[in-house]
Amino acid sequence: MPDTTKHSSAKELNLTLLPGRGLVGPPPAFALAKPWVTRLRPALNLSPAPSFLLGEGGVRGQSLSSLKGQVGAQLRGHRSPSGAGPGISSYASNPAQAGESLQGCLEEALTLVPKARHQETPMFLGATAGMRLLSQKNSSQAEDIFAAVSRVLGQSPLDFWGAELLAGQDEGASGWVTINYVLGLLVKYSFSGEWVQPLEETPVGALDMGGASTQITFVPEGPILDKSTQATFRLYGSEYSVYTHSYLCFGRDQMLTRLLTRLVQSSPTPLVRHPCYHSGYWATLSPAALYESPCVHATPPPDLDQNLTVEGTGNPGACVSAIRGLFNFSSCQGRGHCAFDGVYQPPVQGRFYAFSNFYYTFHFLNLTSKQPLATVNATVWEFCQRPWKQVEASSPGQDRWLRDYCASGLYILTLLLEGYGFSEETWSGIEFHKQAGGTDIGWTLGYMLNLTSMIPAEVPTQGRAESYGVWAAGVVFAALTLVATLGAAAVHLLWPQG
């Protein structure tokens, strides 16, 4: 098995303006049908310089370059900093440390931006599902964390614009924009200095899975009947209407926490048999951490301090049955255009890019080469049936995540096939990718394209990108996105392995 060292964990975003900052510039280049918060845009007069993003699986990052002379902006490269750490929501009990945790990544990011451009380089802090969960559980702790990180970032030489807690719909829509922008399926910047629309190109759908939530976004064949699930973009004179929905608590880490909690609840003894763990695997744990997750609604037992023993049985059939119990499929009985949990969804169609934990799981299982569904299913089941010692021996250095690949693989199949409604025929349209167009896929780039109005909403009368001025040419931005690891992350770190 390949060594998979990066995992997208629970991601953590309403824009908080810093004192004294006003709105600058015309309206944003695109907006949702349920509008995003009002975007800032600076009076840019910047020469090209590197910019950076931080996020994806704790505090991880990438740098981007917006370089295209004085006549446009073209994403050109990326680089990941060496620092990594847990998401800011993990500092709920000590918010000050959330700010301090950013220092290493911030210092490295400063080296990517020329010193002369520091004060002119905008920086944003974004947060998604992990912080959404913390806000539900304890809003005051979430506010304290945002205050702490804002203090630290506000003292940076960069131009910190503020922080935002992104709604699930915005997260999904931003991921869709990222993919289709870097693939050149929305607009392209030509060598002649023009924004041009691709001919007869169909946008691809986006399947994103973090640690706390999962998102599906695509252009359906027919009209979107539930307007609360519709996002509308206007890019370079063309309007796009996409279906998008985010399922909170259906990200990988929270799924694993909910699954384990159900097994603990149904076990008559302190010995919990886990069908998704390999035979021969065992671990002891305190169940208290399970009930700290806002995604777990079960009543805690009176003896929370009593340790439990979890023993793997390596039974993929029983594992699938347990995973199905996390979904409410009966709520869609008799209803057309319904996924699960009573959520409206039109039929899937076209190509899809599956990224984040979709990719990381299938990359580990060597299933990212567009294998047919029968092969994928057989491979996952065979892996689940391997003894733990064999799995350990074939994948050294993977102890932290190794026991969960079976559950993650079967969960992805259940979600895609029984949840979203992919079939053997439509399965071939799913591609599992970490990157698109040489750029790591995620919501952050799409979010910043909207925030900075980098892509024009309308076709200029001159037909040239120069008409947008230097703001569209030299946009240099820096965005901080922070990923929370709740519940299951604590279990991952505290449990002994084997």
Where would I find each of the regions flagged by the language model?
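Gly/Thr-rich phosphate-binding beta-strand-loop-beta motif of the actin/hexokinase/Hsp70
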Residues: M1-P2, A10, L17-P19, P35, ...
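Ser/Thr/Pro/Gly-rich low-complexity, intrinsically disordered segments
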Residues: N14-T16, F30
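Intrinsic disorder
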Residues: P28-A31, P42
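Helical "lid/coupling" subdomains associated with nucleotide-phosphate turnover
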Residues: S63, P81-K115, F124, T128-A206, ...
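Acidic, polar low-complexity linker/tail segments
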Residues: G77-H78
